[in-house]
């Protein structure tokens, strides 16, 4: 299956390295966990695309083909990374996207889904943090409904 690689520039000026698989219908945005987008295997992306998804994987800030931030610049947060994901998803289609993240990408995906509920239709977040035994430092609703 053919994929396309390009750059996406967020409204804040961050450039994200992005790869697309499949048609433009039914977007699925994949967030990697602490490494490059290549942690989502090509075979998985291709299989999902053959199933009718527009699979989009990308490098978070400071990884792979995305913007590398100057260490002297102000720090960024999970909320900034979540805003990057939302900007990318909004740039794909008028319809909400399914969002999936692993590791750090899972934490970013959760914040993105909470901060930008109209941008995402679903969230898949296996392995969302460093330890399943870690205590939560935030309180999240057990369910979120669209209005």
Language-model features and meaning:
Residues 7-68, 74:
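Conserved HGGG/HGGXW glycine-rich cap/lid loop of the alpha/beta-hydrolase fold
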Residues 136-147:
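Helical cap/lid subdomains and adjacent loops of hydrolase enzymes that gate the active-site channel
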Residues 95-138:
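Conserved hydrolase catalytic core segment
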Residues 45, 86, 114-117:
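A structural alpha-helix within SAM-dependent methyltransferase catalytic domains
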Residues 1-7:
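An N-terminal hydrophobic leader/cap segment in hydrolases
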Residues 79-97:
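Conserved acidic catalytic loop of the alpha/beta-hydrolase fold
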């Amino acid at each position: 299956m053919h994929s396309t690689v390009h750059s996406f520039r967020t409204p804040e000026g961050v450039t994200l390295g992005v790869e697309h698989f499949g048609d433009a219908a039914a977007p699925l945005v994949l967030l990697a966990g602490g490494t490059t987008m290549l942690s989502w295997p090509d075979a998985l992306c291709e299989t999902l695309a053959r199933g009718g998804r527009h699979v989009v994987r990308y490098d978070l800030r400071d990884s792979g083909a995305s913007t590398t931030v100057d260490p002297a610049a102000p720090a960024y947060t999970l909320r900034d990374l979540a805003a990057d994901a939302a900007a990318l998803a909004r740039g794909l289609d008028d319809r909400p996207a399914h969002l999936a993240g692993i590791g750090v990408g899972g934490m970013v995906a959760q914040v993105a889904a909470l901060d930008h509920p109209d941008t995402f239709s679903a969230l898949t977040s296996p392995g969302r943090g460093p330890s399943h035994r870690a205590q939560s430092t935030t309180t999240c609703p057990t369910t979120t409904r669209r209005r």
